[in-house]
């Protein structure tokens, strides 16, 4: 079988971009079991409840749901187990320092295969207040309406 090239998206956490202000992003490798990789290759995963915790100098991904592999036997994995993230020491120290200082949290944004290896995009994020969410939604809607108006104007259709 030919080696995979490029990036193949498995799961995306759209809720994280809605609930948090994203400050910085990192790409991390994942330590996975065989049946987890097979389940991911089927495109089955959920990042909705996921978060990253740094414990004794190691980054761990919690709450990510990778369902059991359908053809797996007794060697199948637990669906919501914690998984170790592979990051450089400098990155782990920087993330830990910023989380402790500024009260930020670390959330997963996307899970994908990059050149055949499972990767997760994690982000340092700060929680949005409910009025922030409403303001962002209103701004997005206003931008959409102006783009539609410009598009209609360019096509010759007047309001």
UniProtKB/Swiss-Prot annotation:
Pfam family, one: SmpB
Compositional bias (Basic and acidic residues): 137-147
GO MF terms held by the record: RNA binding
This protein's UniProt keywords: Cytoplasm, RNA-binding
Statement: the UniProt record of this protein carries the keyword Nucleotide-binding: no
GO biological process: trans-translation
Location (main, coarse): cytoplasm
InterPro entries hit by this protein: SmpB, SsrA-bd_prot, SsrA-bd_prot_CS
Region (Disordered): 137-159
Role: Required for rescue of stalled ribosomes mediated by trans-translation. Binds to transfer-messenger RNA (tmRNA), required for stable association of tmRNA with ribosomes. tmRNA and SmpB together mimic tRNA shape, replacing the anticodon stem-loop with SmpB. tmRNA is encoded by the ssrA gene; the 2 termini fold to resemble tRNA(Ala) and it encodes a 'tag peptide', a short internal open reading frame. During trans-translation Ala-aminoacylated tmRNA acts like a tRNA, entering the A-site of stalled ribosomes, displacing the stalled mRNA.
Stated name of the protein: SsrA-binding protein
Annotated organism of origin: Nocardioides sp. (strain ATCC BAA-499 / JS614)
Source species taxonomy: Bacteria, Bacillati, Actinomycetota, Actinomycetes, Propionibacteriales
UniProt gene name: smpB
